């Protein structure tokens, strides 16, 4: 009986609670009111945020107001790589340079460019290169250059970085140069002739290497000859001249030798040396030691030394006058007593034989004829008078030239007489 009474009481209380909830709709379950509807909850939180009150968890972990943690070095590197890849994704479609076909140009030019493609592919498979321009180095793809290239006019040159010393160049563009750009091959735009010549030399070198591997003796000899010729071209040439040279030998032999050397150089300013020496063996032999055995007394020795010094001084003056005629500059090193060297550099064009007076007269008459034909407004009588006056002037100029030549001959004869007198004195003293 007691259990029934207890159950009845509990059941009656539950019914009262349910009836009270259905009767009063304003009074709601607080758990359901707070967590039942999410949309209402969000509205409540936003309203409370405006007043300053609200959910403390929402305010604490709000992503909008929260500051991010600092990035690590690895994250920074990844971000930089992504930024570098973004512009490459939006670039135009890059063509393989091996698929480009040239309508212009000869077969040799096409073969030369194909060889450059293969060499660039060995260095960089992506065909990324550095182009040499007036403003500096420019990084680009090889196909960009080939699309604008006209093979009938221009060509390409691949420059070896091992032989050339590259210097840092400042470009006007805003792009920054990375360390990886140093590994890219250098290419320069040149003329087609230069490209074909370089390609032919490249093929010749390959053939020579193949023959050397096979063991041919002819190729080795030809290479030795080429090396010797290159060494001769690179080295400065020398002319030996003894102090004891005669006047005739100087005029005939040494003058022709100096003129030939200047003509072979083409008058391009390539310097050469003239060494004035006692002998090939004893180049620096002083004058004091030459006449010790020949002279008996000191007075005779001093006289011979004075005569030798005068001879040497005359020889130096003759050489200087010859160099001035050939339009050359020179610097002197050394001393008359031992050895002297003339470092000579030709200034102008190579020396040539002077043309005859008859050819000059003919050229001048042709110029007069052309000038007279251009001036058609004048009368014939005035033209004839002008011609006669010009002929008179030419005859006077020729007479003056002949007088100058005669004076130069007399001066040379006097110099030769002096030199012959010195030679005679020198020989007389030696015989005594």
UniProtKB/Swiss-Prot annotation:
Low complexity: compositionally biased ranges: 36-50, 75-91, 407-416
InterPro entries: AIM23
Compartments where located: Mitochondrion
Pfam families: mIF3
Main location: mitochondrion
Keywords: Mitochondrion, Transit peptide
This protein's name: Altered inheritance of mitochondria protein 23, mitochondrial
Native species: Candida albicans (strain WO-1)
């Amino acid at each position: 009986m007691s259990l029934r009474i207890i159950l009845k009481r509990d059941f009656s209380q539950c019914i009262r609670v349910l009836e009270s909830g259905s009767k009063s709709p304003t009074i709601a379950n607080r758990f359901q009111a707070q967590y039942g509807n999410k949309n209402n909850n969000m509205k409540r939180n936003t309203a409370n945020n405006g007043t300053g009150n609200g959910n403390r968890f929402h305010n604490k972990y709000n992503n909008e107001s929260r500051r991010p943690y600092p990035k690590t070095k690895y994250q920074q590197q990844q971000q930089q790589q992504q930024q570098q890849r973004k512009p490459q994704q939006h670039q135009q479609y890059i063509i393989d340079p091996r698929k480009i076909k040239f309508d212009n140009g000869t077969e040799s030019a096409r073969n030369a460019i194909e060889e450059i493609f293969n060499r660039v592919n060995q260095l960089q498979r992506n065909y990324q290169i550095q182009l040499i321009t007036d403003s500096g180095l420019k990084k680009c793809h090889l196909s960009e250059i080939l699309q604008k290239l006209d093979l009938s006019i221009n060509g390409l040159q691949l420059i070896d970085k091992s032989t050339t010393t590259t210097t840092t160049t400042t470009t006007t563009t805003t792009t920054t140069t990375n360390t990886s750009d140093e590994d890219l091959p250098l290419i320069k735009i040149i003329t087609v002739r230069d490209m074909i010549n370089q390609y032919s030399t490249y093929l010749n070198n390959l053939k020579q290497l193949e023959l050397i591997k096979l063991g041919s003796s002819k190729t080795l000899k030809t290479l030795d000859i080429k090396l010797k010729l290159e060494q001769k071209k690179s080295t400065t040439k020398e002319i030996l001249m003894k102090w004891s040279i005669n006047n005739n030998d100087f005029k005939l032999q040494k003058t022709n030798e100096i003129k030939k050397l200047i003509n072979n150089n083409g008058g391009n300013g390539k310097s050469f040396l003239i060494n004035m020496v006692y002998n090939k063996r004893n180049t620096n032999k002083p004058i004091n030691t030459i006449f010790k055995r020949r002279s008996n007394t000191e007075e005779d020795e001093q006289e011979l030394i004075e005569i030798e010094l005068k001879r040497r001084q005359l020889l130096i003056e003759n050489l200087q006058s010859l160099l001035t005629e050939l339009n050359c500059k020179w610097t002197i090193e050394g001393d008359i007593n031992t050895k002297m060297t003339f470092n000579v550099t030709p200034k102008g064009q190579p020396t040539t034989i002077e043309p005859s007076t008859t050819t000059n007269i003919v050229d001048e008459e042709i110029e007069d004829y052309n000038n007279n034909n251009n001036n058609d407004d004048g009368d014939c009588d005035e033209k004839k008078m002008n011609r006669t006056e010009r002929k008179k002037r030419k005859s006077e100029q020729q007479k003056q030239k002949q007088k100058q030549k005669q004076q130069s001959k007399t001066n040379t004869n006097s110099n030769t007489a002096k030199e012959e007198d010195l030679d005679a004195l020198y020989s007389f003293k030696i015989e005594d």
